[in-house]
Amino acid sequence: IASMFDEPEATATLSTLDEVHIEYAPDAEAAALLLAGWLMGRLQLGASSDELELAAHEGRPASLDFALRAEDKAGQGRKVALRLIRGTTELAPVGIHRVTLRSGDSSFTAHGTCSGGTPCIELRSPLAPPRVQPVQGRRDSELLVAAMGIGGRDPLMYEALRHGARLARGAGRHLRPQG
């Protein structure tokens, strides 16, 4: 995802970002929350626990909508919508089907695919031709041990976990069983 914003013109669109959508496999909620937390940290997005709304109210929701705020250097805030979407059971690398960042009419998308048995991510941007990159990642548990274990101490991972946990706690308030 980050590689789509290496060019200065693409980086500039992040200052007008208004939507982030993360579609994930049914068993990959933790990965979706961690990715959302990482994006919140990198894009300096925040949310209060009162800014959570459910898009579906019966049983387990199909999506969760969070109203986030981005602060610019002048202290001006703007709204950014974060939507976590529970997708289908189709295979995708690391359980994330698609991530879309929208800024006005511009859309930057990373879509997980499996081509010939090799997990890949297709990247689409209005500023560059589409490209496919192989996924050479490790399991979530291995990443956590590497980032937080002896010799790790990755501050980005701690920040992503903190933001993801806030989202999970906010969602949990709305997902408790009735009765």
Regions found by a protein language model. Give the residues of each.
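ATP/pyrophosphate-binding catalytic subdomain of soluble kinases
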Residues: 1-68
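Long, compositionally biased intrinsically disordered terminal regions
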Residues: 35, 41-48, 57-179
